[in-house]
Amino acid sequence: MTTMTITPAEDFVKAAYQHGIKDQKKLQELKNRYSLQFKRSPFSNIELLKAYRELISRGEMTEDRDFFKVLRKRGVRSHSGIANITVITKAFPCPGKCIFCPTEPRMPKSYLSNEPAIMRAILNDFDAYRQTLNRLESLYRTGHHTDKIDVIVSGGTWSFYPKKYQTAFTRGIFNALNYPAPKARSLEEAQKINETAANRCIGLSFET
């Protein structure tokens, strides 16, 4: 007979649940006490969410919406039930000559490489599919619902990108939202699949 070993994070989650923790302040107090008692650094919310999900999957805990909200990190991002994902287009010549507009090499016009969204885009080579999938995974890890997604496309002047690039970029977004379904070959097909996907696009805006 195999004995399941409980991890420190799972042990903490069980203790927090048994203590009836219902707000971030009480959770942090328990984190601090646990940290002092066991001489370890405090658990991150991501670690606790992973442990919570594992305990539920093994049938050792039942789902509790209020407790889940306490463990979830940065709840304001999806407080309305809609999660936002920003995807950045690659650098492309802009016809504008605005004096105040930054023109950093290899960056979309008006954006700087030290901005969080741009840094994520750089890590994903400005690929729409990879950026979207990366953000979905991040949202899931931090406890956010991803069934309703509002996508914002930022970057250079969208209307001056080649039509082929516009279509491929947008298709990449939908293909990522449709994962793990196979990638669609056309934008129309990707949009159709997304109508019944787990991560549905309920809004798509181009802020360029």
Model regions: which residues?
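Flexible, acidic/Gly-rich N-terminal and inter-domain linker regions that tether
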Residues: 1-118, 122-131, 135-181
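Extended hydrophobic secondary-structure segments that form protein cores and membrane-embedded regions
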Residues: 150-155, 202-208
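Short mixed-charge
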Residues: 175-200
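Residue-level signal for functionally critical sites in structured catalytic/ligand-binding pockets
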Residues: 77, 195-207
